[in-house]
Design a protein with these regions (language model features):
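Thiamine diphosphate
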Residues: 1-145
Length: 145
């Protein structure tokens, strides 16, 4: 967690390429201050924040192992305003059909762009812990055992 935004290095090394950092909201907040660095260096970087107001992937793993959900939810700042506070530009996607156009607009705009998209990991729990486990691990075993 927290390793997505350091994609700044890719933007430094390959300034002509499209660089996309994909971060969960919890992981993003662990290194979000690096947006200042990206803005100061005038990088072209798109940061996609998938927002569920929780450590969603940790929740999925804990639920898959039968643990009670505890201490995994949190409140987020207004990410669009947060991006603006660093001199970046932010936008919010409200549905899946808006994601591709929002990313394309962010890449075309240049500079540091933050795109926030809500996500519901509950489908992951059903598919990854149930259906995929049965297909990949065999009867009675979890895929990560």
């Amino acid at each position: 967690m927290g390793a997505g935004l350091p994609a700044i290095a890719a933007a430094l090394i390959h300034p002509a390429r499209r660089v996309l950092a994909v971060c969960g909201d919890g992981g993003f907040m662990m290194s979000s201050q690096e947006m200042e660095t990206a803005v100061r260096l005038k990088l072209n970087l798109v940061v996609l924040v998938v927002e569920d107001n929780a450590y969603g992937m940790i929740r999925w793993k804990q639920q898959a192992d039968g643990f009670t959900d505890w201490g995994l939810t949190f409140g987020n700042p207004d990410f669009v305003a947060y991006a603006a506070s660093y001199g970046a530009r932010g936008s919010r996607v409200t549905g899946a059909d808006g994601l591709a156009p929002a990313l394309e607009a962010a890449f075309n705009a240049g500079g540091v762009q933050l795109v926030v998209v809500p996500i519901d990991y509950s489908e992951n729990i059903r598919v990854l812990s149930g259906e995929l486990s049965k297909l990949t691990a065999g009867p009675g075993r979890k895929a990560w055992d």
